[in-house]
């Protein structure tokens, strides 16, 4: 909304500068709140195109406005007639409001689901040390980029709706509003760059013979977070010095500065499609190679399935709409770009975490361990080495096989088979004594 107000103010200022020196015996050039009219002689009929800012209200704004210069001045036009001539549909306002409200609800739900699923995925990967590896670190950075994207959407909506309600801010174009848009654009670009990092990592894993994951990891961080920083800073400086209009949230097809953001994203998608083809070719060769073990081949296949699915899934919609003007197929663009795009974070979490075999196995292992500790007591440990003050060293190993359903446990008919082995070795001077005890009773502390 601020961009529309500022664009109207800019058109008014240009009109006043253009018509300031015009002297005529007929009608003087002027700005009539809607459009700029040139000077004309009495009896002259003037036809001008609809102002360019009507493109914000309608896809069909290429109409004309007309006035006649009379002895009493310009003929008056009803503002509603002007709106109709310039393609503004008065009957469609309610339907448009309902559509935009539905779109906002749709992408709010999508980003909320993505935010919850991505946060859960990060917690799962962080809690288990067995899942700490370069591959999952890259996944977590990708998760964080989509989390920041969802947060940026919520913050942007809150700020822009406040700006619409307070039209006084439109004249000043607050720095906070622009900062939110800059952060929003950064998060979008970062999500594409980290998807590119996923493709680069998988390609390096398959193609490089001696692949140092730790060495390459810092380069991946530089690409994923540093690359968007450079381009977004360049775009921000360009907007601030050459096109500082409104809150920077309106994207015009004629805005050349917008390509500072579009070009890197398109380049990352193009690189991912090239990697897509190369990975398929290398993967086919490795799977068919007899020197590659079955387990290693399955590992390549599982990682490739997720990455190769995400590359076309996230790239096609951006490429389709990148070269289409913003005012064409607005409804279709909003549905694909906002609603479907808002669920991308959820898809990432499902493919890289929830459907990951290693993650599922680790969750099952922790669940069984928690279930066993809950049955035996909170102080029970699988292995508990202790060192006494007299030099005794004990190692206790507990193995329990439990076959007990909840119903039988409540009926107190649970049968447990417990095998307890206590291995103790005591050293006194030059003598050694070994003792092995087996039983079916509770383990007590040995001192």
Curated annotation (Swiss-Prot):
Pfam families for this protein: 7tm_2, HRM
Side Extracellular, residues: 1-103, 156-178, 239-256, 326-337
Disulfide bonds: 15-36, 27-69, 50-86, 177-247
One Gene Ontology molecular-function label: G protein-coupled peptide receptor activity
One annotated GO biological process: cell surface receptor signaling pathway
Function: This is a receptor for VIP. The activity of this receptor is mediated by G proteins which activate adenylyl cyclase.
Name of this chain's protein: Vasoactive intestinal polypeptide receptor
Taxonomy of the source species: Eukaryota, Metazoa, Chordata, Craniata, Vertebrata
């Amino acid at each position: 909304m601020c961009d529309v107000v500022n664009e109207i103010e800019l058109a008014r200022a240009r009109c006043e500068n253009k018509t300031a020196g015009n002297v005529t015996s007929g009608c003087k050039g002027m700005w009539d709140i809607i459009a700029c009219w040139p000077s004309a002689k009495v009896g002259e009929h003037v036809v001008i195109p609809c102002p360019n800012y009507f493109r914000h209200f309608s896809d069909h704004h290429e109409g004309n406005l007309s006035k006649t210069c009379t002895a009493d001045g310009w003929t008056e036009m009803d503002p509603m007639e002007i709106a109709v001539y310039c393609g503004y549909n008065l009957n469609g306002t309610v339907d448009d409001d309902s559509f935009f409200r539905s779109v906002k609800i749709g992408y709010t739900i999508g980003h909320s689901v993505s935010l919850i699923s991505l946060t859960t995925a990060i917690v799962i990967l962080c809690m288990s040390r067995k899942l700490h590896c370069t591959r999952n670190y890259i996944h977590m950075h990708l998760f964080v980029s989509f989390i920041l994207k969802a947060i940026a959407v919520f913050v942007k909506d809150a700020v822009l709706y406040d700006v619409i309600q307070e039209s006084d801010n439109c004249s000043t174009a607050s720095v906070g509003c622009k900062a939110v848009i800059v952060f929003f654009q950064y998060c979008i670009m970062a999500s594409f760059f980290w998807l590119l990092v996923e493709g680069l990592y998988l390609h390096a894993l398959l193609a490089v013979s001696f692949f140092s994951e730790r060495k390459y990891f810092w380069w991946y961080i530089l690409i994923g977070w540093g690359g968007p920083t450079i381009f977004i800073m360049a775009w921000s400086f360009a907007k601030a010095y050459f096109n500082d209009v409104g809150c920077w949230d309106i994207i015009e097809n004629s805005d050349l500065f917008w390509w500072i953001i579009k070009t890197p994203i398109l380049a990352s998608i193009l690189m991912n499609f090239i990697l897509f083809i190369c990975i398929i070719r290398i993967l086919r060769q490795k799977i068919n190679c007899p020197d590659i073990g079955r387990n290693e081949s399955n590992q390549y296949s599982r990682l490739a399935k997720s990455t190769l699915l995400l590359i076309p899934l996230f790239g096609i919609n951006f490429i389709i709409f990148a070269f289409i003007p913003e005012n064409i197929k607005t409804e279709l663009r909003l549905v694909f770009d906002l609603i479907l795009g808002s669920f991308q974070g959820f898809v990432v979490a499902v493919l890289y975490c929830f459907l990951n075999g290693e993650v599922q196995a680790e969750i099952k292992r922790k669940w069984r361990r928690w279930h066993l500790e809950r049955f035996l007591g909170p102080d029970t440990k699988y292995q508990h080495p202790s060192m006494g003050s007299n030099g005794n060293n004990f190692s206790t190993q507990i193995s329990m096989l439990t076959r007990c359903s909840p119903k039988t446990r409540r009926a107190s008919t649970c049968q447990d088979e417990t095998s307890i082995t206590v291995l103790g070795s005591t050293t006194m001077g030059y003598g050694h004594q070994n003792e092995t005890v087996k039983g079916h009773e509770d383990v007590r502390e040995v001192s």
